[in-house]
UniProtKB/Swiss-Prot annotation:
Pfam families: RuvC. Homodimer which binds Holliday junction (HJ) DNA. The HJ becomes 2-fold symmetrical on binding to RuvC with unstacked arms; it has a different conformation from HJ DNA in complex with RuvA. In the full resolvosome a probable DNA-RuvA(4)-RuvB(12)-RuvC(2) complex forms which resolves the HJ. One of its GO terms (biological process) is DNA repair. This is Crossover junction endodeoxyribonuclease RuvC.
Length: 168
């Protein structure tokens, strides 16, 4: 299974691709897309859409795992993140790739075992799990963490699907 993890943001959008399953995951690619604040909003969104669509076409992931950010204290930040989130959803819909959202606590629990893990613990676990020596960007690290979280949740999703099919 190939999973694209997405840490949504307008100024910085993290993307990370992993392949494998919960027992053995392999790093394929990661990047942090950056848009300039001087760019007009349509140009920023277009750039993000084009790059996400390009990765979807090139790697053909089976799923996308995106951070579900429930609460933002600053309305303007929430609005901008929401626009980036929407652009990713559009690219996924156009490519026919299902999206799965995970909250920050789910990611922390999945990778570290506690919902109170800090950023350094997450980065350490991503690097250790994928055998990456250098990971310079927090947004890309978050994206890879989301992809790994999705892989970890796959056995539970499969069991739930089988149970639902038996009940029907």
């Amino acid at each position: 299974m190939i999973v694209l993890g997405v840490d949504p943001g307008l100024a910085n959008l993290g993307l990370g691709l992993v392949e494998g399953d919960v027992r053995k995951a392999r790093h394929l690619y990661h990047v942090c897309l950056t848009t300039e604040s001087a760019w007009l909003m349509p140009r920023r969104l277009q750039y993000l859409h084009e790059e996400v669509a390009r990765l979807l076409a090139e790697y053909r992931p089976d799923a996308v795992a995106i951070e579900d950010q429930i609460l933002r204290r600053q309305a303007d930040v929430a609005f901008k993140v929401g626009q980036a989130f929407g652009v990713v959803q559009l690219a996924c819909a156009q490519a026919g790739v299902p999206i799965h959202a995970y909250g920050p606590m789910q990611v922390k629990r999945s990778l570290v075992g506690t919902g109170r893990a800090d950023k350094e613990q997450i980065i350490y676990m991503v690097k250790a799990t994928l055998g990456i020596r250098e990971l310079f960007n927090n947004h890309a690290a978050d994206a890879l963490a989301l992809a790994l979280t999705h892989l970890a949740h796959q056995p539970m999703r499969a069991a739930s699907t089988r149970l639902a099919q038996k009940s029907a």
